[in-house]
């Protein structure tokens, strides 16, 4: 107990000496954080041994000491990495290397030279908010190389430059929705207006594609700068398009004219083929019915002609001719004659009934009906049964998706009458993705953890990658990683199950192909 108190007091003395010396070297700041790391380690050990107080200092719970020790270790690693860069010999104060400064926006970067930026919303001086713009921002790229960038402010927000890319860490439009009602704000730096009241706008989404001419450097001039009328008109005219873009941010991408024309041609061809098939089927049915009717009417006519011919020769209606010149009386007395006549009468009745049915069926087919008696008589030439037609249509609807059709659908997939498999195949034509942005090691940890804990909730992961400037090889922004899915339902389940680490941003999208 006494030994722990003595060690704790010794650490307090070392910290007081560092604060009094106030050295502005990077080595002194590393020593400061190494001393701060020892303090929570000592308190953690004391709590583990059941000690609740060291002198006048209460011992916190182990979780608090563990968190502070980890923060100190992380700051030591960051400062030691900065010491190997070209900026190690610059003056560094306790404020520049504090955990509060390191965590302020932009988070995870060392910063110097704070400048106040005042933004007035709705032209109301009482409705104002203060922001901090840093003169210099020190950031590390994906290759663990440190860079020094200047900050600036425009009507969109506060940013720092990564090559030619403006990385915004404060957006005024977000707070305009929170604090204002008209969506207008005025930007002041050091109590001087640098941007007159402007309306809501958003920064362009493509890296390096922000062509804002109205920008202010970190150190403002004494002259008052305002947005000219031309740029203000451009901002106002672009506002509906930008609003529409934000509305479609997580939807499907707008289709090009060529893709739209190709889709319309495919649809018109499919409609033409379906119409031609239906016409050919109706023609074949009508032709078959008519030919059947003609044959039956011809047979009936021949039968009636034979009957009338026999009557004209003086035979009774019930007699029939079996051949030769035998007399009718002899034939009528023979037992085979009656059966033959009966057979002939039954054939004649069947012919008449079939002719009547054929005529009705032909009338039904001419009237547009595909069912009823006419359909039963023309089964060989008519279309298949409804059950067979449903199965055949279902197989055509649930066929596989070829590589050329992936991403070809420009419509939202309907959930009606397709089934689970049909919906998956339809959504395969426009596979959904999630793009995550953050530190490279953090994204790799997300990928490895998802492969262990969330297997089956995604399709595949990409490696970490970055945008590259168009006029050089410098990497722009934070590293990215793509996560692909088989369907929008799978993406939703993945997004609900996964908890992204702090500092990782996500966005939804879809691709024509993977």
Swiss-Prot record:
GO biological process entries: DNA replication; DNA-templated transcription; regulation of DNA replication; viral DNA genome replication
CC annotations in GO: host cell nucleus
SUPFAM superfamilies the UniProt entry points to: E2 regulatory, transactivation domain (SSF51332), Viral DNA-binding domain (SSF54957)
Any one GO MF annotation of this record: DNA binding
InterPro entries according to UniProt: E2/EBNA1_C_sf, Nucleotide-bd_a/b_plait_sf, Papillomavirus_E2_C, PPV_E2_N, Reg_prot_E2, Regulatory_protein_E2_N, Regulatory_protein_E2_N_1, Regulatory_protein_E2_N_2
Region feature DNA-binding domain, mapped onto this chain: 430-514
Biased composition, class Basic residues, residue ranges: 248-284, 323-333
Region of interest: Transactivation domain: 1-201
Region described as Disordered: 197-424
Membrane-traversing stretches: none
Organism superkingdom: Viruses
Keyword DNA-binding (UniProt): yes
Biased composition (Low complexity): 199-231, 285-321, 334-346
Post-translational modification: Phosphorylated. Sumoylation plays a regulatory role in E2 transcriptional activity.
Homology family: Belongs to the papillomaviridae E2 protein family.
Protein name: Regulatory protein E2
């Amino acid at each position: 107990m006494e030994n722990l108190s003595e060690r704790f007091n010794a650490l307090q003395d070392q910290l007081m000496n560092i604060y009094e010396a106030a050295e502005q070297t990077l080595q002194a700041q590393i020593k400061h954080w190494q001393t701060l790391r020892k303090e929570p380690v000592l308190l953690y050990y004391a709590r583990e041994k059941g000690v609740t107080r060291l002198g006048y200092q209460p011992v916190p719970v182990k979780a608090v000491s563990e968190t502070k020790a980890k923060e100190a270790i992380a700051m030591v690693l960051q400062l030691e990495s900065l010491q190997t860069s070209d900026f190690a010999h610059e003056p560094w104060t306790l404020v520049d290397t504090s955990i509060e400064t390191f965590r302020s926006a932009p988070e995870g970067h060392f910063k110097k030279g704070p400048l106040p930026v005042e933004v007035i919303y709705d032209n109301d001086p009482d409705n104002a908010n203060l922001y901090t713009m840093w003169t210099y921002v020190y950031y590390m790229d994906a290759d663990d190389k440190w860079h020094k960038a200047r900050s600036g402010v425009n009507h969109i927000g506060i940013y720092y430059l990564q090559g030619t890319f403006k990385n915004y860490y404060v957006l005024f439009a977000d707070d305009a929705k929170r604090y204002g009602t008209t969506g207008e704000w005025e930007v002041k730096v050091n109590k001087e207006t640098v941007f007159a009241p402007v309306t809501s706008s958003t920064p362009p989404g493509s890296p390096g594609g922000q062509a804002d001419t109205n920008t202010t450097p970190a150190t403002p001039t004494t002259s008052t700068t305002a947005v000219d009328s031309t740029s203000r008109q451009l901002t106002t005219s672009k506002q509906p398009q930008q609003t529409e873009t934000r509305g479609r941010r997580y939807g499907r991408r707008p289709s090009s004219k060529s893709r739209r024309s190709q889709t319309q041609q495919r649809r018109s061809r499919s409609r033409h083929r379906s119409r031609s098939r239906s016409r050919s089927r109706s023609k074949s049915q009508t032709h078959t019915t008519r030919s059947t009717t003609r044959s039956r009417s011809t047979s009936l006519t021949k039968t009636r002609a034979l009957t009338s011919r026999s009557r004209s020769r003086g035979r009774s209606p019930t007699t029939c001719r079996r051949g030769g010149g035998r007399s009718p009386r002899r034939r009528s007395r023979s037992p085979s004659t009656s059966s033959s006549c009966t057979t002939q009468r039954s054939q004649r009745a069947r012919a008449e009934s079939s002719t009547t049915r054929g005529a009705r069926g032909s009338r039904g087919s001419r009237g547009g009906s595909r069912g009823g008696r006419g359909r039963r008589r023309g089964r060989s030439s008519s279309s298949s049964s409804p059950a067979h037609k449903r199965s055949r249509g279902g197989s055509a609807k649930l066929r596989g998706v070829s590589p050329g059709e992936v991403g070809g659908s420009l419509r939202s997939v309907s959930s009606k009458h397709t089934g689970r498999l049909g919906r998956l195949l339809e959504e395969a034509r426009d596979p959904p993705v999630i793009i995550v942005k953050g530190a490279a090691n953090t994204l790799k940890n997300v990928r490895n953890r998802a492969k262990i804990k969330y297997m089956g909730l995604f399709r595949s992961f990409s490696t970490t990658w970055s945008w590259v400037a168009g006029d050089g090889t410098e990497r722009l922004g934070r590293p990215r990683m793509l996560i692909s899915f088989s369907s929008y339902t799978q993406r939703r389940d993945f997004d609900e199950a996964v908890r992204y680490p702090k500092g990782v941003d996500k966005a939804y999208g879809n691709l024509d192909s993977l």
